[in-house]
């Protein structure tokens, strides 16, 4: 008897469970609204699911739902496989949402209702992900994709310099001509060599393209240029830019015979005025010759600078500068003791990227240029030097003629013994009374 009763209870329990499975109800909208607060902002309207039963006439109704929490917990493990098989036959269609009155009446009518979420519940999210991030994530998550199979288009600016270094590539694929960059790019199809295409376009690239267009427009209409327009970024510092790889943009080593080009540097006007004011004060105190002052005053023009460089290279000019430096009152002894500073700044589109080695090179170059210009300024012009040499030769000739005349003329002695004049004197007294 006990076994028969137990079997009957088991059969009735299985039949009730099958009836509950056939009379499955969709989830309540009220429960989904309370549990999906954040998802509601990015999801489409909720879909109500309706299972297909073997008996199509057996429609869903509120009265036929007899699901309880106890029965659901006991039968969830046994019917998991059956639910997964029936999930493939689910029809998805949009149902009109229930009103608040119907929800309230249903909850009061059937308080034992329990929400069951189907296993095939899918949410359709809106696509707010950027394409570059989406493509990058798909490549990272794909185990079969290699970096050699991905065609990456790098940026020309330092915003992606970390990516270039991480991949071990010194030059990017975008360091091509400007015409190729501005032309519309057609990405290759996936069938071409089986590679993907990723493009990186940074904010610095956008500014660079804008400035290049502004520069091209400004060259055509230079007379009507806007003074408020920002300067171009042609010399922008970038490892991947092909402009800096040219020899013209590389810093040249310092040399004593060659001076830096005129268009690559400029002289600070405040230091110039201070230097020339110091030289005028030294000249007023009684120090220098007229040739050095004229050389210092005329050394501003480019023609005089070329002349001073020629005088420096010639051996005669170096000898004259050595001779003038040996004088006690020369300007070389005054100015070498207190060297004047002079700075040269190379024109570049971006500041703050120069290394310490370049700064030291520029300082050494400035010292050499300053020393050369000081020596060339102290060298006298050829006209003044010739005049000084001619005067010196004339004085020597005059002294020689006087000495010859003295040797050839007879000597006269003084008759007055009390006279203290020398017997070898060139001028003797003819009258003995005049010595008294």
Curated annotation (Swiss-Prot):
Single GO biological process annotation from the record: cellular response to heat
Which residues lie in Basic and acidic residues bias regions? Answer: 7-21
Q: Where can this protein be found?
A: Cytoplasm
- Region Disordered, residue ranges: 1-34, 165-195, 211-266, 282-360, 389-436
Q: What GO cellular-component annotations does this UniProt entry give?
A: cytoplasm
User: Which segments show compositional bias classed as Low complexity?
Assistant: 211-226, 238-261, 282-299, 401-436
Keywords tagged on the record: Cell cycle, Cytoplasm, Phosphoprotein
Positions carrying Phosphoserine are 53, 61, 102, 172, 299, 301, 303, 325
Q: Which family does it belong to?
A: To yeast MFL3.
- Further facts: Present with 2200 molecules/cell in log phase SD medium.
Functionally, this protein is described as follows: Can suppress the synthetic lethality of the hal3 sit4 double mutation when overexpressed, suggesting that it is involved in the G1-S transition.
Q: What is this protein identified as?
A: Protein VHS2
By which gene is this protein encoded?
Answer: VHS2
């Amino acid at each position: 008897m006990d076994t028969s009763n137990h079997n009957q209870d088991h059969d009735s329990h299985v039949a009730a469970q099958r009836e509950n499975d056939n009379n499955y109800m969709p989830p309540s909208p009220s429960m989904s609204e309370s549990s999906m607060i954040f998802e509601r902002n990015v999801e489409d309207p909720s879909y109500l699911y309706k299972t297909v039963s073997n008996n199509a006439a057996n429609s869903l109704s509120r009265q036929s739902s007899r699901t309880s929490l106890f029965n659901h917990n006991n039968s969830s493990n046994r019917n998991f496989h059956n639910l997964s098989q029936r999930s493939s036959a689910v029809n998805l269609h949009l149902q009109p949402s229930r009103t608040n009155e119907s929800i309230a009446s249903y909850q009061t009518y059937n308080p034992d209702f329990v929400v069951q979420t189907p296993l095939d519940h899918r949410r359709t999210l809106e696509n707010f992900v950027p394409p570059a991030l989406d493509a990058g994530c798909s490549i990272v998550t794909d185990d079969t994709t290699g970096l050699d199979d991905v065609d990456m288009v790098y940026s020309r600016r330092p915003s992606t310099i970390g990516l270039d270094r991480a991949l071990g590539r010194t030059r990017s694929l975008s360091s091509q001509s400007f015409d190729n960059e501005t032309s519309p790019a057609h990405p290759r199809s996936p069938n071409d060599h089986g590679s993907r295409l990723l493009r990186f376009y940074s904010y610095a690239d956008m500014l660079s393209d804008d400035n290049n267009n502004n520069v091209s427009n400004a060259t055509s209409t230079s007379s009507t240029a806007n003074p408020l327009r920002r300067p171009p970024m042609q010399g922008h510092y970038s490892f991947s830019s092909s402009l800096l790889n040219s020899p013209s943009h590389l810093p040249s080593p310092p040399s004593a015979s060659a001076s830096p080009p005129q268009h690559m540097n400029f002289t600070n006007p405040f230091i110039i005025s201070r230097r020339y004011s110091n030289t005028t004060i030294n000249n007023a105190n009684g120090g220098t010759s007229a040739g050095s002052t004229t050389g210092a005053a005329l050394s501003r023009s480019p023609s005089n600078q070329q002349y001073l460089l020629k005088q420096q290279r010639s051996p005669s000019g170096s000898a004259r500068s050595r001779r003038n430096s040996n004088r006690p009152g020369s300007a070389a002894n005054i100015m070498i003791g207190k060297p004047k500073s002079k700075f040269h700044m190379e024109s570049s589109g971006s500041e703050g990227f120069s290394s310490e080695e370049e700064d030291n090179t520029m300082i050494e170059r400035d010292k050499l240029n300053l020393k050369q210009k000081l020596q060339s300024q102290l060298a006298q012009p050829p006209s003044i030097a010739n005049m000084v040499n001619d005067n010196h030769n004339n004085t020597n000739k005059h002294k020689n003629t006087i000495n010859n005349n003295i040797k050839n003329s007879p000597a006269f002695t003084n008759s007055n013994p009390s006279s203290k004049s020398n017997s070898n004197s060139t001028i003797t007294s003819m009258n003995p009374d005049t010595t008294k």
